[in-house]
Amino acid sequence: MLSKIELMLLRSLETGKTYTPEEAAELSGLSKDAVLKAAYMLQERGYVRVIENVRTHYSLTEEGERYLKEGLPEEKLYSLVKSGVNSMDELRKRMGREFQIALGWLRRKGAVEVEGDKVVPKREPSFDERAALQAIKEGRGVDEGTLKTLMKRKLVTKSETKQVYIEVMKKPEIELEDIITDLTPEMLLEGTWRGKQFLKYDITIPAKEIYGGKIHPYERIIEECRKVFLEMGFTEIKGHYVQPAFWNFDALFQPQDHPARDMQDTFYLDRYIDLEGEIVERVKATHENGWITGSTGWGGEWSLEKARQLVLRTHTTAITIHYLAENPEPPQKAFCIDRVYRRETIDATHLPEFDQLEGVVLDRDVGFKHLLGLLKEFFTKMGFEDVRFRPGYFPYTEPSVEPEVYVEGLGWVELGGAGVFRKEVTEPLGIRGKVLAWGLGIGRLAMLKIGLKDLRRLYLPDLGWLRSMPVARK
């Protein structure tokens, strides 16, 4: 017994001929998806044969195109060596990062040898790879060994396309059966569905994928963090990306010669802001001699000029400490989720800009155990069952801890820093009470939740990966 779409497809096609889904759709009046659906059902009945041809295509990568145009690194290096430029230092200077690549390939070919600090030519090499790049660009074939080498060097990429053909094998003597394809609300209300025959659906048949809009997985995790703290009674605060070094460092009792304040760690602007007032004088005195905090301070002379310089904030603590200075009376519960900037070398776990979750609790009767309980509750709500705390050190908190969560396959992973603000931080700003504070890297948390090994993946426009991400996570 054939369904309506099977019958429509068979009636429109000729026995013994082969059609593409597009051709069959035009002849039958069905959509391409309906044609494929009917074809796979008819194949099971032996009326048609669905032929799937997979075509492999090779193309040059951006680097492959450049090497084809400018020459392979080993070609350039051999040309220099042959012309008399043999010094390793000079060759590195001329070729940059391509020097090691080129030297490695020339040594494999037996074309050069390294003698001391010199590269010496031995025999004329062949550069078949460049000819192969040209052949691939023109759509011609190359031998498998060369192809593997080019793909290993990431000069060539492989892609596959699938073409489906429908061949009609035979046609039965058939009549249109009264098979219902749609169950309507009216049929359910009136009960007319009883005794009817409904079309069976094969859920394994390929169909066109539909990609609906959804929130980016990283943005969703940020929103989860925000929701947790709002549910815990916190107020969300915001602040400027550009801050005076005073609020980013000095107000947090970070010494002016601290390594974190070096040019290689912080983005400094060539601009300054006016600073004056009682708070500035108190912070100055605290750094120099401890003021009235009971501390001896850092000693030396505190520089107002350094404190006046603007920086791209290195942590959102600059926002929370400023908030507490403006709201010094307890109780206060605030958090900030925002972007921060540091002069980091980009790799799988570091970026020069990233998101940080910062929070503070100001009250008279809170202590270290409350901080641990609060952080444990947050991580539990975020889906981490095993949480522990390791002693840490930060210039502006004492005691200090680093929270860690256990992840299957990775072990214990550190996710930030926390502690109780020192008196050298709170008293100069007029803050009345104890302050629990923490700063967590959301990027690393997101990597664990999503299962990524490379932080950069969160920011790449990889539609394939984004489409594969589920709308909801466990």
UniProtKB/Swiss-Prot annotation:
Binding site for L-phenylalanine: T317, Q356, L357, E358, Y396, F421
One Gene Ontology term, aspect cellular component: cytoplasm
Enzyme class: ligase
Keywords for this protein: Aminoacyl-tRNA synthetase, ATP-binding, Cytoplasm, Ligase, Magnesium, Metal-binding, Nucleotide-binding, Protein biosynthesis
Binding site for Mg(2+): E398
UniProt-recorded Gene Ontology molecular function terms: ATP binding; magnesium ion binding; phenylalanine-tRNA ligase activity; tRNA binding
Co-factor binding details: Binds 2 magnesium ions per tetramer.
Reactions catalysed according to its record: tRNA(Phe) + L-phenylalanine + ATP = L-phenylalanyl-tRNA(Phe) + AMP + diphosphate + H(+)
Subcellular localization, as worded in the UniProt entry: Cytoplasm
Source taxon at top rank: Archaea
PROSITE patterns given in the database record: AA_TRNA_LIGASE_II
Family designation: Belongs to the class-II aminoacyl-tRNA synthetase family. Phe-tRNA synthetase alpha subunit type 2 subfamily.
Subunit structure: Tetramer of two alpha and two beta subunits.
Stated name of the protein: Phenylalanine--tRNA ligase alpha subunit
Originating organism: Archaeoglobus fulgidus (strain ATCC 49558 / DSM 4304 / JCM 9628 / NBRC 100126 / VC-16)
